[in-house]
Amino acid sequence: LSEVVFRAAMSFDVAALHPLIERAYRGETAKAGWTHEADLLFDTRTSAEELAGLIADPERVILLAHDGDILIGCVQVARAGQDLAYLGMLTVEPTLQASGLGRRLLDAAETEAVARFGARRMEMTVIRRRAELIAWYRRRGYAPTGETRPFPVDPPRPELEFVVLEKAL
């Protein structure tokens, strides 16, 4: 990776952002990386319409990572309470996973949470069965709170329960 530049997503970014997220989370392309959900979930991760709504929401930001003109990653940060921010949709181009970009996106998200929302804590959720991903976040200072949340699908899939992790910023 040469010069990685981070910036907030804007509405015109949806056309490039949506396929990146789908490539990283679902289907055969996701299997080029180690953080995919392709073996657990078979539908789409998000939609272009949902992304446009997230980008337009003043209570959240999606940070993009570019290497030159190429979109290579993103992460979402949202205000979740008085001093709490929520981290979600951390995405790295599958062929670039394990390059350190995820860590850089996480650092940028934490910095943005403090600067934009005045957060002193960051919360996130990870599917309980993703032990290797939970371990990755634990190495970066996130700890399980003991709280769990249902995975938002109908009909419910209890085996996909979320574990809540939190870190002081």
In which residue ranges do the predicted regions lie?
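C-terminal "cap" of GNAT-fold acetyltransferases
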Residues: G118-A143, E147-L169
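Conserved GNAT-fold acetyl-CoA-binding loop/helix
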Residues: E22-E50
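A short, internal acetyl-CoA/4′-phosphopantetheine-binding micro-motif in the GNAT/acyltransferase core
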Residues: L64, L90-A98, V126-I127
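Conserved beta-strand in the GNAT
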Residues: L64, I70-A78, Y86-T91
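A short helix-loop-beta-strand connector motif used in the catalytic cores of GNAT acetyltransferases and
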Residues: T46-L63
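Conserved acyl-CoA
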Residues: R104-R121
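Conserved N-terminal entry element of GNAT/NAT acetyltransferase domains
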Residues: L1-A15, P19, V163, A168-L169
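A conserved beta-turn-beta hairpin within the catalytic core of GNAT-like acetyltransferases
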Residues: R79-L90, Q97, R116-R120
